[in-house]
Amino acid sequence: CIRDSSDTEQRIEEAIAQGAVRVSARRHAGHIEHVHSANCTALQLGKNLTEVHTVIGTGGPLINSTNPRAALEGVLADPVKEPDILLPRQADFYLDADYVLYAAGLLRHLDDDVALTVMKNSLKKLP
C-alpha cells in the first residue's frame, strides 16, 4: 500500500526525467573510437560536446521537480565510467522556470530584443 502517492509519483517523475536527460545527451554526443592504424590511434565519431559549459532545462518534469539540477547533471560525462564519451565534465545549469523558451524562439522572428529579454527573465541559475 502506498501511503503518500503524491511523494511516490514525484520520485517516479524525477527518476524518469533523470533517465531522459542522460539518454538524450548520450544520443546526441559523439565518442572516441580507438583504432590501430599507422596514421592515428583514435577517431572522433559524432559531435564533440566537451566544450559546452551551459545546460538549460525546460519542460514540466524539470520545472516541477524539487531538484532539477540532479536531472540535468545527467548530461555530464563520468570520466571513470565513460572516458570516451564527448560530453562536458562540468557545466552551469539553468532552468526555463516559466517554460517560455519555445515561445521566445518564435518571438525572435518578430523582435530579437524582446525575445532575448523574455528568455533572460525566465532563465534561473540552479545552485
Segments predicted by a language model, with ranges:
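Helical "lid/coupling" subdomains associated with nucleotide-phosphate turnover
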Residues: 3-127
